[in-house]
From Swiss-Prot:
Specifically expressed in testis. Expressed by cancer cell lines. One of its GO terms (cellular component) is plasma membrane. Signal peptide: none annotated. This is Kita-kyushu lung cancer antigen 1. The gene is CT83. Its main location: membrane. It comes from the Eukaryota. Keywords: Cell membrane, Glycoprotein, Membrane, Signal-anchor, Transmembrane, Transmembrane helix. Residues 1-3 are cytoplasmic. The chain crosses the membrane at residues 4-21. InterPro entries: KKLCAg1 (IPR027940). Residues 22-113 are extracellular. It comes from Homo sapiens. It is a single-pass type II membrane protein. PANTHER family: KITA-KYUSHU LUNG CANCER ANTIGEN 1 (PTHR38650:SF1).
Amino acid sequence: MNFYLLLASSILCALIVFWKYRRFQRNTGEMSSNSTALALVRPSSSGLINSNTDNNLAVYDLSRDILNNFPHSIARQKRILVNLSMVENKLVELEHTLLSKGFRGASPHRKST
């Protein structure tokens, strides 16, 4: 009985380690054979090291990882940009309305970012 319990727990531990290993490989940007992401592959020693990060990840590798792991992120980013431009237009309308009504707290000079 104890032998079967030990065997089952060791198999379970092996499966968990294998699952974590596969998940780690997927998160580090290794492309699987069925990946359809359109990203250029450049060696990791590209020389584009971001000095602001503690773990010295390459900026190009991070963007490639994002494209590989989230191929729908480009469409999502485009939708976010469209929504942001709509919000910006609404804020300009609101600012114009407030200035035309004589609200003194609104600044006529907006800083663009």
